[in-house]
Structures are given as structure tokens and as C-alpha cells.
Amino acid sequence: MFNKYVKTFQYGNQTVTLETGEIARQAAAAVKVSMGDTVVFVAVTTNKEVKEGQDFFPLAVDYLERTYAAGKIPGGFFKREGKQSEKEILTSRLIDRPIRPLFPEGFYHDIQIVAMVVSVDPEIDSDIPAMLGASAALVLSGVPFAGPIGAARVGYINGVYVLNPTKAELAKSQLDLVVAGTSKAVLMVESEAKILPEDVMLGAVVYGHDQMQVAINAINEFADEVNPEVWDWKAPETNEELVAKVRGIAGETIKEAFKIRQKQARSAKLDEAWNAVKEALITEETDTLAANEIKGIFKRLEADVVRSQILDGQPRIDGRDTRTVRPLNIQTGVLPRTHGSALFTRGETQALAVATLGTSRDEQIIDALSGEYTDRFMLHYNFPPYSTGEVGRMGAPKRREIGHGRLAKRALLAVLPKPEDFSYTMRVVSEITESNGSSSMASVCGGCLSLLSAGVPLKAHVAGIAMGLILEGNKFAVLTDILGDEDHLGDMDFKVAGTTEGVTALQMDIKIQGITKEIMQIALAQAKEARLHILDQMKAAVAGPQELSAHAPRLFTMKISQDKIRDVIGKGGETIRSITAETGTEINIAEDGTITIAATTQEAGDAAKKRIEEITAEVEVGKVYEGTVVKILDNNVGAIVSVMPGKDGLVHISQIAHERVRNVGDYLQVGQVVNVKALEVDDRGRVRLSIKALLDAPVREENAAE
């Protein structure tokens, strides 16, 4: 019934198994990948026909996590999986980025990749198996794909690179880097690091690429065994006559446009060139396919002009050389009621970054397959359409916004203070108000500045820069601080963030089939030069953490005995509610007895702290207290006196006065304030008090007679 194929290979400390022919046989290809107890099922489906008028490559990648994979039932009312989580979106992008450049130009058939996690080992992340499964399934589908690709996670522990580290090993690692590529070159890198030098980062990329050859070879052997039917697809032939016509109409105007330094004026000139082409070559009778072909020729002509100018040593689009960073403008404290804010402008790219401080109650709760955890630092990136002068829909963040926010967050994680040194929850929002290249790196710079503006004691300043590449044959140029057009028309988007001491985040996407180690070395060196330049200007604007905003909560931390927690909370939460209501504070009590008080003023925090100290204080033997009589006991036993909130003691009838007391009510009344001395606290916490011990003993009559 099943024509099943299995391939097993050793990958670091893990055994990887590829299987096909048993599940989802109606898909173009389907592969089940096992790495330890983590199992990911990947299916590829294709459209043999191109949709009418299609002028782009419609690749869709969806990575999905099923809660049953971890033996869980989803929360919520409907008890089923809903919209994709941030982890699912980021992993979908991780799969997409290295495979997209391996499809030939002009291939416009629909391709859908669905990677589904069906079993999960908490120690083995499912992203690497998902990437390997997508690679294998694409090769088995027979589509024109210049793969397979391999993928590897690289850690760096005690000066040694570790292949595919477990979750426990990553906790000790200074690096979490994912690299993907073909047998010949690297295509994609995604990483975060704890301030590592450039040579260590490059070494990790090279190490990962070397190690992934095992996976690439295994997938090739797997494909040879399955022997899939290969698509008979040929790239459409170039219409040289049409190319010549478009060049004749628009060539000179395009060259003139790319001499204009200002983006909007340049765009207007390019629109003029395109309108001339449309007027001359596109009529009502022209079908969509032909119109798209003309548009594609025009876009390639734009790319040719920009690329040839740069490779010939001419100035870039905005007049810079290959190493210069655009002019910077930095302002902090730009919003009066926020906790911290910064406006970071680099050329025509601008980010308004705003930092907000909160308490531990504001931490983000993440219900991951591997278990629930909280996150005390959030960074959210918003890219509204007005940032590029366009009209567009506003709504939930798109995949790109999620990815850019995550990259900026990775860049700042290494410099955040430890929770014990700074117990606030931190949220940064980066609003991109202008965009012409590298808005994610503007978010890194702006995010760092806004945190400093909010008074967060960062370990160091962090800046980010985006590098580009133009590569033709043996000629290449690495570009510092790329513009939007250089990103679209170039061959690489290489983003590096870090401090003066080293790299904290690195992301690389290659649009061609790989680059060499030499190019990566040059890009890292140029990026460091630019990063140091930006850091100098950031430090000149904000040397270190500013004073805490008057509008930010003040956090006061204290520690109480665990057996006192219930006293502070009170019956049904009555005590803690009264403290928060009376002092206007927020109080959080951890299981270990650590109490965090959030207050808007020092006075309110001190008042709440004092109340808690009173509740948790122990009565000291020999100490004098001012107390209130709360009860007269029956049978003339004595009275109960409250000496502290929640702390009562017994004044026995014999301890009320030196003379013999016949009726307690003759001496004490409920509500009466008296001074008492603590005589004893027994093993059960019961307190004996005395009023008599503070009274002078009466003078005897015989002494008086003398």
C-alpha cells in the first residue's frame, strides 16, 4: 500500500530521520523529519499552471505548531489552535528566506509549504527539522529548485562551537545562530549573541555551513533513492527587441532619475519614465502578461543602471561612496508624558521609539509548546503606510513587522540589566515615521536611546547598520547603510547590531545563490566601522541612563519570611487590598517572599513598605509598645491589646496594676490606648504583655512613716 523511503543520518549529537511515501501522498511531496523526539511533517504542493497575469513568484510558507505535540489541549473557549503565534511566524520566515532565492527568475507557479510540528522534545527546537524537511520536500517535488539547502544551529560555549545545541546548552551559550545554505555558499543567517567579536561570528557561520554538508548530502542521497519526476520547465526567453524599445524610451530618463538625491523627486522622475513606456507600448489591447513583461523589463533596467554605476565606482543613488553613513539626528525625551522616548533619524529613515516601564504583572506570558514562561522585555515594531508616503491598510502587524521587531529585540537583549538589578518590565515600541532603507536598524538605535531616556541602566549602547552588496562576476561592492532602492536592486541585506566591544545580533539574507567568506569578512569590517561611528553620536546625545521619569512607577523591593505571606495578603486578600487602596500602590508577592511595590511617588512607596513591615514585624521581648485594648476577656482573665497590625497580646489581670485588681473593667476599656511591655513570646507565637511593668511600684507605708 505504501512505497516508503527512509534516510537516517547523524547530525551533531542528534539522529535525524527523513521519511516519505506514507503520509500525504496526494501532495507534490511530503516528508516527515524526526530529530530526537521532535517530529515535523512538511508537505509541498504546487500549481502546474501559472495564474493569468501573474508577475511575481507566489511562495507561501506556513509553519504550524499543534498543541497535541506537547500533550496539551489548547486554552481559550474554542479549545483549538487559532492564529499563528510569534514563534510560528518567525519560523515561517526562517524557512522562507533561504529557499526563495533558489527558484529561477520567471518562475511564477504557486508553491505552498506547510510544516507542522506533530511531536516536540522540549530540548530540541523544531525549526531546524522544519527547514530540513522543507528542503527535502522541495527536492522531491521536482520543481526547478537549486537546492537542497542545509540548516544548522550553532552555539558557542566556553570558546567552542556547538552544533545543534539543546535548550539546556543554549542557556549556557554566548551565541544562538541559525545558518542555512547550499553545498557551495551561505544564504541566510539569523542570530543573537552576548557581545561577541566579528571573527567569532564569522567563524560560527563558516562552522555551521561546513557541518550542514552532512544534511545536504543526506537529502541528495534520499532524493536519488526516491527518484522523483522532475518538472519540464524552461525560463521564458528574453524578448531582446522589446528590451531595446524600453531602453530607447526610458534609458536616459532612468539614468537622470538615479542622479537625483532626494527620494520623492527621484520617484517622480522614475514615474515619468514609466509613464512614457506605458504610453508608447501599452494599449487597451495589450494583455496582462505582455504588460507585466514590459514592467519587468523596466524594473531590470532600473537595477542595471544602479548596479553598473556602483560597480564602476560612481557615487551611489544619494551621492555617497560605499562606506559613508547617512547624516544622523538624535533627540531624546521628545514626548512629555512617556517614560522614555527618542527620535532617531538617519537620512530619510526615521524611528520614533518609546519605552514604557511596568511591574512584573506586565510581563508577557507565553504559552509555548515547551512550557509556559514570561518575558520581561518586549519590542514592537510598527510600519505604517505613511512612512513611505503611501496609502495603505492599517491593522494587525504583518510578518515583516513581527520579524523586524524580533531582530531589534535580539540586538538589545545582551545589554539589558539583570532582573535583580532592575526589576521593571520593559516595553519598547518603534514607530517607523519615515522609511528609506534599514528601518529595523533605526529601531535598534532608537530603542536603545529610549531605554536610556527611561532610566534603564543598560550595560552599553547598541547601534545597528544594514549592509548591501552588488555582485557581477568577479566584481563586487559592499555598501554601508543601504537605501530602500539599494536593498531592492542589490544582492544582499546584511544587518549587524552591537556595542563598541562586539556583535549582539546578525541577520543576513542573500538574493543570489550564495556569497563567499571574503565578502562576509569585508561586510563585517565595514559594518563595524559604521557601527562605531553611530555609537559615537549616540553617546554624545545620551551618555548613560537618565533619571527615572516622574510618570514611571517607582519599584520598592523587600523580603519577608514565607510564613508571613498570608499575613500580608490577609483573609480573602483583605489586607493587601486595603494597603493598595490606602497608599495607591501595586503590590506583587513572589513565592519566595520577595515583595515588589510599584508606586508613582516615593511617599506612597514608603507608606506601603511601612505597612508591610508593621504586619510582618515580630514582637520583641522587653520592648515597650503603644497598643489599643481590643477586647476585655470574660471571667476577669484580662484584656487583649493590639500592639501592631495583626499582632495582639494578652495582659493578664495580674499584669494590669501593682495593687490587686478585682474587676478588669475598672481599669481598662475597649479602645483605650495603653503602653505595654512584651514579657514573653511562646513557641506558638502567643504574646504576654504587661502594663504593671511600666508603672512605678507603690511606696510602702512603713517606709513613708520613717
Swiss-Prot record:
EC number: 2.7.7.8
Cross-referenced InterPro entries: ExoRNase_PH_dom1 (IPR001247), ExoRNase_PH_dom2 (IPR015847), ExoRNase_PH_dom2_sf (IPR036345), KH_dom (IPR004087), KH_dom_type_1 (IPR004088), KH_dom_type_1_sf (IPR036612), NA-bd_OB-fold (IPR012340), PNPase (IPR012162)
Residues in S1 motif domain copies: 622-692
Any one GO BP annotation for this protein: mRNA catabolic process
Alphabetical keyword list: Cytoplasm, Magnesium, Metal-binding, Nucleotidyltransferase, RNA-binding, Transferase
GO molecular function: 3'-5'-RNA exonuclease activity; magnesium ion binding; polyribonucleotide nucleotidyltransferase activity; RNA binding
Any matching Pfam family: RNase_PH_C
Necessary cofactors: Mg(2+)
Family the UniProt entry places it in: Belongs to the polyribonucleotide nucleotidyltransferase family.
Protein name (record): Polyribonucleotide nucleotidyltransferase
Species assigned in the record: Neisseria gonorrhoeae (strain ATCC 700825 / FA 1090)
UniProt gene name: pnp
